[in-house]
């Protein structure tokens, strides 16, 4: 267990071009490499400068065009006139004793999302949001309490990554990306894939697809589209229950889908990508943590190449759910392992700053308890 300590909340005001008066500039992170090359040619500049600019953003961690010292002064002035590197502000930065850091990012239109940097030994992982809010309605999760406003652009997703990277010392680099922040990533597949295309590229963050995980409640058509994209990202399916009756209570979107179609789509993704599947299961005390639940879960996973990530519930103020007892957790694990299921109980990180699984939220106001 992690010893809980009071939250350290550090208000951070960051001035960006998006805050200035006058016409809003183009968000540079929304522009593809080809679009940037075309723009450079229109400005009378060489197209190869596009990769130089990318390297400054992702490897050089530049936050202004003036820092891009190997670019001609005229080009730096042109970039400054037309583009903003960042299009949002850091409203609040919170840091926990275990090294986890969370940023509340305020977007140009006033929307807010949260993203997290997790430190675990040599690993430097980031948890990134894909939507402002979430429409999936999982009853125990903070992210969907206020519904969903809109999808994030690829640039807004990349901006979260860069802001989290800036929290690292110069001799450290990001190692893993998990699309497990606010929102349903597969409900914003174009934005997510465009951001990850940059994140995995050599002139981007250079992170292998094998170190990138996309989480989903299980949207079969979108899972098939992800498979068709042909990039072997890790897929994590949020299951949370071993039968349709209970899952439909906890994950309302299941009423329109059902567990079996989700499992079949996950199987298709496994065969297309060659990547072992991960299933996520938030363990709720007295609700889905019983011996029979564990046995049913073992049955539906039998014969599948999977890793089962079990996450003891991280409390959300105002919601009527609790973390299971130590005895219930131990029994649940024992039943899964005795059935041959590869199981990992996720270590709690960042819960003291509401940065743990299921705690990310855009509105920290009063929570109305759900039934």
UniProtKB/Swiss-Prot annotation:
Cofactor binding: number and manner: Binds 1 [4Fe-4S] cluster. The cluster is coordinated with 3 cysteines and an exchangeable S-adenosyl-L-methionine.
Positions bound to S-adenosyl-L-methionine: 183-184, 215, 238-240, 314
A GO molecular function held by the record: rRNA binding
Keywords assigned: 4Fe-4S, Cytoplasm, Disulfide bond, Iron, Iron-sulfur, Metal-binding, Methyltransferase, rRNA processing, S-adenosyl-L-methionine, Transferase, tRNA processing
SS bonds (residue pairs): 127-357
Cofactor list: [4Fe-4S] cluster
Alphabetized Gene3D superfamilies for the sequence: 1.10.150.530, Aldolase class I
Main location: cytoplasm
Superkingdom of origin organism: Bacteria
Family: Belongs to the radical SAM superfamily. RlmN family.
Note: Reaction proceeds by a ping-pong mechanism involving intermediate methylation of a conserved cysteine residue.
Protein name as annotated: Probable dual-specificity RNA methyltransferase RlmN
Native species: Rhodopirellula baltica (strain DSM 10527 / NCIMB 13988 / SH1)
